Amino acid sequence: MEQNRVRIADIAEALGISTATVSNVIHGKTAKISDATVKRVEQELEKTGYIPNMAGILLARNNSRIIGVVMNDHVKYEGRVLEDGFVMSSLNALSREANEKGYFLMIKTTADIREIPVFASMWNMDGLILMGFCEADYEALRSQTRISFVVYDGYFAACSKVVNLTIGHYDGGYQAGQYARELGHTKALCLADNDLCMDKERMDGFRAAFAPGKALFWQIPALQKERSAYYAEHFRRFLNLHSTVVFAASDFYALDFMRFLQTKGVRIPDDVQIIGFDDTAASRESVPTLTTVHQDAAQRAKTALACLEAMRSGKECEAQIVLPVTLIPRESTRKMPCWTL
């Protein structure tokens, strides 16, 4: 059907519903219409071309069905934040959940949290999900926007209509440390690009469980070129440490260090064992596959949207929600009777 010939009656007939229902959806009067029906109508409107650009209708509504997702484009990502394994996994899960519930996702990357209120108000969003701004001033941000938002892994005092949706960072580190100790390790090396927020919790958990074993911490450079130089410069020192297991704050750093060691002839897991954190797709595809701490991106996405919906309808949500994590043993670790490093 051509765009200028499509009528509301055509849409209603195709879906087997009344013209009044279609009209109400178009004009945002959906209080008495099920989410499933709203979604069907919106999909049919787009498919037939009745509304070539839904933005005008969405922005005019009280409920735009737009969820903004803002990621901190930190310098460590070197301009490729959307390529990060954790970010990709999170966005994929949010996209699936948003589609299921009839929402539209709008994605923005920025290193400046001050851009967020403008972004949110410009598009009349139903809610926001923020990632990577661990110690930002969320109270100030909240005062600048009427929109409720969910923060992934924030570190801030509780404030109105903001949910801190985090995971068991300390517990994940603890599980990794306990597992390493059970394998018989007594010397470990911990890697992260900072000793703050979630990375600190992960390292603290590892150290607590690994005791009385010795766990040394290296704060590695965030940028790839500098990090590679750091590894090369400290390789001899690493060998002299006789650390038989490495725990990294993320799968990215675990795999990065594993590749470096492999270029130096170090065998994984025969000579050194490695544990990561996040359970990204790359951890399942590496050679050897990476032992890591799994976090459920789908569960977090489902919880995030449920919180936004609840806050929008005036209900109270917990100020902080902590989701569980689970250690996943794979090929980069195993119990060894002897070491040849």
Predicted regions and their residues:
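Alpha-helical recognition/docking segments in bacterial nutrient-uptake
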Residues: M1-Q3, N62, I66-Q178, F235-L241, ...
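Flexible loop/turn connectors
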Residues: F235-L341
